[in-house]
Structures are given as C-alpha cells and as structure tokens.
Regions:
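Glycine-rich NAD(P) Rossmann-fold beta1-alpha1 loop
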Residues: 12-16
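Short amphipathic alpha-helix with an adjacent loop that forms part of the alpha/beta core around
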Residues: 43-47
C-alpha cells in the first residue's frame, strides 16, 4: 500500500471538499491518503515518508492562494525530486492556480507528475455528484501511476 499526502488550503470550503473526494478515490484504489491543511505543516520533515503528493489551492485573481506560495518554499526544502505529484483546485472565473503549482512541482521540485496534468473544478460543480466523482477519478488515476 502506497501513501499519498494531499496538502491544500481553502477559503470557502470548496477546495477542501475536493481534497476529501480525491482522498476517497485514492482509498478506493487501495492506497492510504492523508489530508493536511498546508497551514498545519510547519517543517519539511513533516513532508517525508510519502510516495505521492497532491497539492490543492483555489484560484484568486488568477493565482494560487497566498498560503500555498509560502508552503511551496517550505516544500522545496523537502527534496521531493522523483516523487509522483499532482495539483488541483477550485475556481470561479479562471482556474490558473493548479497549473502554476503543477509547473512548480515539475520544473522546480523535479517531481514526476501525473499524466493527467493539473485538475480544476468550477466552484459550482464541487457540490454536485459529477464534480465529486471527477475528484475521486483524479485520485484513482494518481494511484494507477503509483502501481
């Protein structure tokens, strides 16, 4: 059984719901999912021991939430090179944050990223069955790459 960390922040609760549903998908695929708010992670040592990392942030003003920017500086110190990664987030008008996080994980952290790329979900779809199922599918797809 592989262990996946889902680290996120959320202002309205939508990205948190996405994190929970992605974790459900990971568990459905037979792996362990641990969910943490990024504000609870205080050191790079807390990022060790996982096989994959899925980071989530809502998009505000075409960018990730400020706490995610701070977290990425911490995560860079954790030396996640070669680990599997993914990124997700909710949005109202534009969904740029997950792609920015994804690119940082790929090009700065040198992580192996999920084949699906980053995952965006319009806030209005987070509370409907199809949206939550899409989140579960994203979690399952990450597990397919974990083996």
């Amino acid at each position: 059984m592989k262990k996946v960390l889902i680290a996120y922040d959320s202002r309205t609760g939508k990205t948190e719901k996405m994190a929970d549903s992605i974790a459900e998908g990971i568990r459905m695929a037979g792996h362990e999912a641990e969910i943490k708010k990024i504000t609870q992670i205080k050191s790079e040592a807390e990022l060790q021991g996982y096989d994959a990392y899925v980071l989530g942030s809502p998009t505000y003003h075409r960018d990730m939430i400020g706490t995610m920017k701070t977290f990425l500086f911490l995560a860079q110190k954790a030396k996640l090179e070669g680990k599997l990664g993914g990124a997700f987030g909710s949005y109202t008008h534009s969904g740029d944050a997950p792609a920015i996080i994804f690119d940082t994980m790929k090009h700065v952290f040198k992580m192996k990223m999920t084949d699906l790329g980053s995952f965006n979900l319009k806030e209005a779809l987070v509370d409907v069955t199809e949206g939550l199922r899409a989140c579960q599918d994203y979690g399952k797809s990450i597990c397919e790459q974990l083996g």
